[in-house]
C-alpha cells in the first residue's frame, strides 16, 4: 500500500453548524465512495475553513460520520481578498494501491471552480 493524498472542498450556503455538518459529511462521503475507501484506509485529515465560517469545526462532521480513530485537525484558510467565501477544504492522507493519477479529488457544487484541473 502506498500513501496518497486526496483533496476536496465544498462551499456552504450559510454559516450554521447543522448545515456545515451536512455539507462536510457529504464531502467526506463522496471522497470515500469515489475512491473506493473505507474509514480504515484513512491516515489523517486536515480541514481548513475560510475565516467567515465560525459555527463549528469541520472535523465534528467527520466524528459524527463515525470517523473516530483517525487524527483530524482544523485550521483557518488564508484570508485572501476576493477568495470564494464559506469554503471548507480537506486534505486526506490515505492508504491505497491506486496510482496517484487515479485518485479522485472531490470538489462539490460551486467549489468545483476552485480546482478545475483536478476536480472530478
Say what each PLM segment does.
Residues 1-120:
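Terminal domain-initiation and capping elements
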